[in-house]
A protein has these predicted regions:
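Local alpha-helix boundary/kink/capping signal
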Residues: 18, 83, 134, 420-422
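Extracellular, repeat-based ectodomains that mediate carbohydrate processing or recognition
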Residues: 25-392
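C-terminal outer-membrane/trafficking sorting elements
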Residues: 398-476
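Bacterial N-terminal signal peptides
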Residues: 9-20
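Composition-driven detection of intrinsically disordered, low-complexity segments
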Residues: 8-9, 246, 386, 402-405
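Bacterial N-terminal signal peptides that target proteins for export
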Residues: 1-10
C-alpha cells in the first residue's frame, strides 16, 4: 500500500470514528437557552433554516409573542456560539409575523418570513449587509391576497432567491422570486408548479448557477409525495417537475434540501412504519437520483428533519419520540462523512422531559450548530447546542494538508478588485483574509471575497490552512 492510500484509509477510519455514538455524544456541549421572554419563542419550519453560520459568526432568527402579536427577532454570536448578543427586534407591527428563514452570504444576512400586516399572510424580506449590525427596511415579496407561507431563501453571486407556497390560484403552489442586486430590487414572482393538488413546504439550495428546489405535493391524490425541479441558469428558466418518491398510500412530507457542488441531498418525513426520516441524493446535479432509503433507526414518530452539508460531511437533526414520551419529543442528530453513502448512528441531543421541536442545523469549519424550540421552562423558548469538532475535515482536505494541496486562490478574479472578488467553482467555501501586518480581518465565502473592506493590500488563504496565502489588492 502506498503512502497516499494509507493516508486515505486512516482518514476514512478517523472520520467514521468521529460519527460514532460515544465520540459524538462526548463532543456535544450543554444546551444554552437563547431567549428569556414572557411568552412563546419559536424557531421556523424545517423546509428553511433558523440558523446560519460562517467562520466565527453564528446567526439565529425566530418569532416570539413577548410584544403581543408575534414579531421576528434576531441574535448573533461572533465567537462561534460561546457568547451571544442581545435580542434584536426586526419587525414592529400590530399583526402576526412568524416562521422566519435565514441565509448568510459573506457579511450579508437575508431573512424572509410570513407576515399578516396586510390581513392575509404574505411573504416579507429584510437584509443586513454588515453582519447584523444594522438592518434595512423590509420588502414585501408576495401579493397573493390568499395565504403565502413557509418561505425559504438562498443567495450566491449577489443573487437572492426566495421560494414559498401560496394559494392565489385556488390551491397551494410553489412560487419563486429573485433579486439580481442582493435584495434591493426584486423581479416579478414566478409560479414553479401548476398541479391539481397542493404543493407545499419548498426547500431551496444553490450551487453556482444551479438552483435546486424540493417540496411536498398532493397532485397524485390524498397523499403527499416529494417533488423536485431545478434551474441551471440562476432561475431564469426551470426544468420539469420530477417525482422523487412513490409510496402512494403514505405521505412523504416536510422536505429539507442541501447542496454542495454537484451533490444534492434531500431528507423528509415518511409515514411508512410510523414516521421515519428518509433520504435521497443526486451526485450529478439532479440528472439522476439514488433510491430513497430510511436513515432513522426507531419505531417512534420522527418529524421535521433539517439538513446541512459542508465538504463531504452531511449533517441531520430531527424531532423524535422513540422513548414513548408522546407528546414529548427530543432532538436527535446523525451524520455521514462520505457524501451520504453511509450514515452514523442516531445521537440524542436533548434529555429534558418536555417538548423539543423545530430543530435547525448549520455547519461552519469544524463546528456543528443546532437551535430548536423547547418547553422545559414552562413556555416555549429557543435553545442552542454546538459540537466544536463535529464536522471532520473531508478525506480530500486532510490529504491536501499532508502535501497534496491545490491552490485554488490563484483563480481569484478580478485581482485587483473594487467591490469584491470571486473564486470560480468555490463560491460556498470559506477563506480568511489577513492585513499586511498579519492580523486576521475576516472570513469570506468564495463568492464575495473582500466585500466591505477598505482599499489596501491583503493576503488570502483557505479556512483551515493548506495552500500558500495569495496576495490580493482592493482599490478605491
Amino acid at each position: 500500500m502506498n503512502k497516499r492510500s494509507l493516508i486515505v484509509v486512516l482518514l476514512t477510519l478517523s472520520s467514521l470514528l468521529l460519527c460514532s455514538p460515544t465520540v459524538t455524544h462526548a463532543q456535544w456541549e450543554p444546551d444554552v437557552r437563547l431567549t428569556v421572554a414572557p411568552d412563546s419563542s419559536c424557531t421556523g419550519y424545517n423546509n428553511a433554516w433558523s440558523i446560519a453560520a460562517s467562520g466565527d459568526s453564528v446567526h439565529v432568527v425566530w418569532f416570539d409573542k413577548r410584544d403581543g402579536d408575534g414579531e421576528i427577532y434576531y441574535k448573533a454570536s461572533t465567537d462561534r456560539g460561546t457568547t451571544w448578543t442581545a435580542d434584536t427586534r426586526l419587525t414592529n407591527d400590530m399583526a402576526f409575523s412568524g416562521w422566519p428563514a435565514i441565509h448568510l452570504s459573506g457579511l450579508q444576512i437575508n431573512v424572509a418570513w410570513e407576515d399578516q400586516r396586510e390581513l392575509n399572510p404574505e411573504i416579507f424580506y429584510m437584509r443586513s449587509t454588515n453582519g447584523g449590525a444594522t438592518w434595512e427596511p423590509f420588502s414585501r415579496l408576495s401579493y397573493a391576497y390568499g395565504v403565502s407561507t413557509s418561505p425559504c431563501l438562498s443567495m450566491t453571486d449577489s443573487i437572492v432567491h426566495v421560494v414559498w407556497s401560496d394559494d392565489r390560484s385556488g390551491n397551494s403552489e410553489i412560487w419563486y422570486r429573485r433579486s439580481l442586486d442582493g435584495g434591493a430590487y426584486w423581479e416579478p414572482d414566478t409560479s414553479l408548479t401548476n398541479a391539481p393538488g397542493n404543493s407545499e413546504f419548498p426547500s431551496i439550495g444553490v450551487s453556482g448557477t444551479n438552483l435546486h428546489v424540493a417540496w411536498a405535493d398532493y397532485r397524485q391524490g390524498n397523499t403527499a409525495e416529494i417533488y423536485y425541479k431545478r434551474s441551471t441558469d440562476r432561475g431564469t428558466t426551470w426544468g420539469p417537475d420530477i417525482r422523487l418518491t412513490n409510496y402512494d398510500s403514505v405521505n412523504s412530507y416536510y422536505p429539507s434540501l442541501a447542496v454542495r457542488d454537484s451533490d444534492v441531498h434531500i431528507v423528509w418525513r415518511n409515514d411508512q412504519r410510523r414516521l421515519g426520516i428518509y433520504y435521497i441524493r443526486s451526485t450529478d446535479g439532479g440528472d439522476s437520483w439514488s433510491p430513497a432509503s430510511r436513515i432513522t433507526d426507531t419505531l417512534g414518530y420522527t418529524f421535521r428533519p433539517s439538513i446541512a452539508v459542508l465538504g463531504s460531511n452531511v449533517h441531520l437533526v430531527w424531532m423524535d419520540d422513540r422513548l414513548n414520551c408522546n407528546p414529548y419529543f427530543d432532538i436527535y442528530y446523525k451524520c455521514s462523512t462520505n457524501r451520504g453513502n453511509l450514515w452514523g448512528p442516531d445521537t440524542r441531543l436533548t434529555y429534558d422531559p418536555s417538548f423539543s421541536w423545530y430543530p435547525s442545523i448549520a455547519v461552519s469549519g469544524t463546528k456543528v450548530h443546532v437551535v430548536w424550540t423547547d418547553h422545559r421552562d414552562g413556555n416555549y423558548e429557543v435553545y442552542y447546542k454546538r459540537n466544536p469538532t463535529g464536522n471532520p475535515s473531508s478525506i480530500e482536505e486532510k490529504a491536501e494538508a499532508l502535501g497534496q494541496r491545490v491552490d485554488v486562490m490563484h483563480k481569484l478574479v478580478p485581482n485587483p478588485f473594487v467591490s469584491f472578488a470571486t473564486i470560480p467553482g468555490h463560491h460556498s467555501e470559506l477563506f480568511i483574509l489577513y492585513d499586511i501586518s498579519g492580523h486576521r480581518v475576516g472570513t469570506y465565502r468564495g463568492e464575495r471575497i473582500g466585500e466591505g473592506l477598505k482599499a489596501g493590500v491583503y493576503f488570502l488563504r483557505a479556512e483551515g490552512g493548506g495552500a500558500k496565502p495569495v496576495r490580493i489588492v482592493k482599490v478605491r
